[in-house]
Amino acid sequence: MHVPVLLEELILALEINPKGFYVDLTLGRGGHSLAILEKISNGKLVVFDKDQDALDQTRPKLLAYKQNIEIIWSDFSRFDFYLENLGIQFVDGFIIDLGVSSPQIDDPERGFSYSKDGNLDMRMDKSQKLSAFIVLNEYPYEKLVEIFFKYGQIPYAREIARAIINSRPLKTTFELVNLVKKVIPALVLVKKNFIKNVFQAVRIEVNNELDSLQKLLEKLPKFLKQGSKVAIITFHSLEDRIVKKAFLDLIRKDKLEFFQKGLPKFSMKVFRPKANELKSNPRAKSAKLRLLLKNR
């Protein structure tokens, strides 16, 4: 069962207007969206997901709110195209949860989990060609090293890349796990789980996650009006750094007007999971919610 992370904090922070317009760019299993739909009577919610399985499994839960919802299958970096086609100029609140959902992790055939044996897949959108299998079996040594350094921050990037080249073809997640265990000393793995970082690096490459996030952040401001909010939940330092920089750039750009008018155009708040949430949902441990507010 998928438990939405930081749900209470997100709903309170959004201060939902019953007649407002909201966009959930990562529908997943619908936890955040359903909480919003319960609070908008005459409002509208547009939801996106690039994972067709997520849309198929979540759609039945949303039928009771069909007059308030629009469901779109797309990568979130193209959200502006769809909103403009719907005639939408401004949005009261954006919700983006950058985590991999529990059903995705728990399905061995999706290849996201290093604790379950399955195919080397890792595609969020199963219609795309690039998969973990292609990355690990066709990428040259230099490209693998770059991925492991850039997206996994792994000090053993060269050794892992060399071992992958020498062990091809790799077909399953456990083959990759066992390869990493042979390369990285056991005492090092006890202190830091670099297997997780290897899987993260490959997943980011397969799904073009950070580039898509950067494009999304560049497009968001034109849809914000006074009172609009953007809530983004991150799960690792790479994506959080990108979100933080984008938010701070908007805040700093307005410094002169701030001194003249006394109210910053943008401001930011940060929320972390409470102890009771961490106890019931350990996967929330690394989650961080950044909220951008447009004040004027």
Curated annotation (Swiss-Prot):
Main subcellular localisation: cytoplasm
Compartments where found: Cytoplasm
Catalytic activity: cytidine(1402) in 16S rRNA + S-adenosyl-L-methionine = N(4)-methylcytidine(1402) in 16S rRNA + S-adenosyl-L-homocysteine + H(+)
Enzyme Commission identifier(s): 2.1.1.199
Group of enzyme by EC: transferase
Domain of life: Bacteria
GO MF, any single term: rRNA (cytosine-N4-)-methyltransferase activity
UniProt KW keywords: Cytoplasm, Methyltransferase, rRNA processing, S-adenosyl-L-methionine, Transferase
Binding site for S-adenosyl-L-methionine: G30, G31, H32, D49, F76, D97, Q104
GO cellular component: cytoplasm
Signal peptide feature range: none
GO biological process, one term: rRNA base methylation
Family of this protein: Belongs to the methyltransferase superfamily. RsmH family.
PANTHER family: 12S RRNA N4-METHYLCYTIDINE METHYLTRANSFERASE, S-ADENOSYL-METHYLTRANSFERASE MRAW
Entries under HAMAP family matching the protein: 16SrRNA_methyltr_H (MF_01007)
Record's function text: Specifically methylates the N4 position of cytidine in position 1402 (C1402) of 16S rRNA.
Listed name of the protein: Ribosomal RNA small subunit methyltransferase H
Lineage: Bacteria, Bacillati, Mycoplasmatota, Mycoplasmoidales, Metamycoplasmataceae
Gene, per the UniProt record: rsmH
